[in-house]
Amino acid sequence: MELTILGSGPGLPQLDKHLSSILIRKENNLILADCGDSCAHRLLEHKVAAEELDAIFITHYHPDHLDGLFMVLQMLYLQNRKRDLLLFLPERPASFLEILQLMYTYPQKFGFNLLIRDIEQAELYFDWIYAVPNDHLYRYASIISEYHLPNQMKSWSLCFTGKQGKFVYTSDIETTDCIMDTLKDAHTVLVDAGHPEAEQIIKLKYTAIKKIILTHGITPELEDRKDELNPEIFEFAREDVVYQI
């Protein structure tokens, strides 16, 4: 299994990093997880052909993980893709379709079938991929309740099983505790270092994880405690590098 990080930046755009997006290749499958801004351009840079993607996963509805998806779909349409494309969404697929319609982007016009599924259904289509709920969006509970909004606060981490073990893409999280049962026996973890408190990241060195890749920025507290990150285990995400798992 191969991991390529297309975007490792935080929600605030930076000149030297792209927004969240990763490619996972296993045997004949190619999966795109999250589609931050410029994702379509990044796929072109990596020479990903129109027919090559098997599925796209969106872990949660924040713009830095989602807003590139619309251009990816438009690109695949204009490239005359024919093969069915699975799109796994975190919540409320009907609302997503309304946004497509707002943009005058109609799946009915695509030359391929866009098969929209709930992200919980991943295992039904790929026996080596499953989604785990996390705590990233719980902080919105009060405003959702106050204004009676339809948001469901669903945010997900993704697990991919390979020959050497399990790869976990945490996506955005508030704590590592919320998915610790999933993390502790992983081979490689791509972990959000921009939201959790420093101790939540540092304590991962006491698990059996072989490699911990820090992405999505870094908190000031973790920056101050970088000397506690064992360089044999921890490293900062490098875009365009192919990681073997």
Segments from the language model and where they lie:
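Core dinuclear metal-dependent hydrolase active-site scaffold
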Residues: M1-H46, D118-C178, V241-I245
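Active-site neighborhood of phospho(di)ester-bond hydrolases with catalytic His/Asp-centered motifs
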Residues: L32-G36, L53-D64, L89-P90, V168-S171, ...
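Hydrophobic packing residues within well-ordered alpha-helices of enzyme cores
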Residues: L43, L69-V72, F96-Q101, I179, ...
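Acidic/polar short surface loop at catalytic or gating sites that assists cofactor/ion binding
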Residues: D84-L86, E91-Q121, V132-S142
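Active-site metal-binding motif and surrounding structural segment of the metallo-beta-lactamase
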Residues: S38-F88
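Binuclear metal-ion centers of metallo-dependent hydrolases, dominated by the metallo-beta-lactamase
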Residues: T176-T188, P196-I245
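Structured loop/turn residues at beta-strand edges in well-structured enzyme cores
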Residues: V48-E51, L124-D127, K184, T207
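P-loop/Walker A phosphate-binding loop and immediately adjacent motor/lid segment at beta-alpha junctions
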Residues: V72-L86, H148-K154, I201-E223
